């Protein structure tokens, strides 16, 4: 299953999840993430869909790099809540949440409908300029990064409202887990990851990729 098809399916499932009444009911409550309310978290999740159409229209002004290099350069992966980038993400997510749950869910669904028409016509070698970070990616690599965000933050939102995470397509979860395993191996070493997944008696306390 091509990454574009997988992303569209995952985005549609996520947009429907954002419309769950439990999300609206808990909008102002604390989320499972430190320093974020449920509304801000939901808005950040919605942004993994709504940011894609404008990204497709943006001019490419920087060099293209690989998906591996993208995550190596990204500063938000260090887990520092007080970092400039993580503080910025929380702020813009809180600002977006002011529009309310109905608007956020509606904008996500509108973006999905737009992308269903547009993505199939994009060239196989299409490149995009990231709205963050001074570099470009292939469209498929960019959509893979959005799949990771949908999976991780979809689970965060589900934990926040006490429900199961949205059922993302298996092909999408396979891609996400492949990326996370590679990131974890760079952080902790390949041997550590192998032990954690195969030898309980030698398993480390954490193999977190993020």
Residue ranges of model-derived segments:
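Conserved catalytic core of Hanks-type protein kinase domains
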Residues: 17-20, 44
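Structured surface interface patches that mediate subunit assembly and partner/cofactor docking
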Residues: 1-16, 23-34, 54-84, 88-210
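N-terminal amphipathic, basic helical "cap/leader" segment at the start of enzyme domains
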Residues: 46, 51-56
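N-terminal interaction modules that seed assembly of large macromolecular complexes
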Residues: 32-45
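DHp/HisKA dimerization-phosphoacceptor four-helix bundle of two-component histidine kinases
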Residues: 43, 47, 145-148
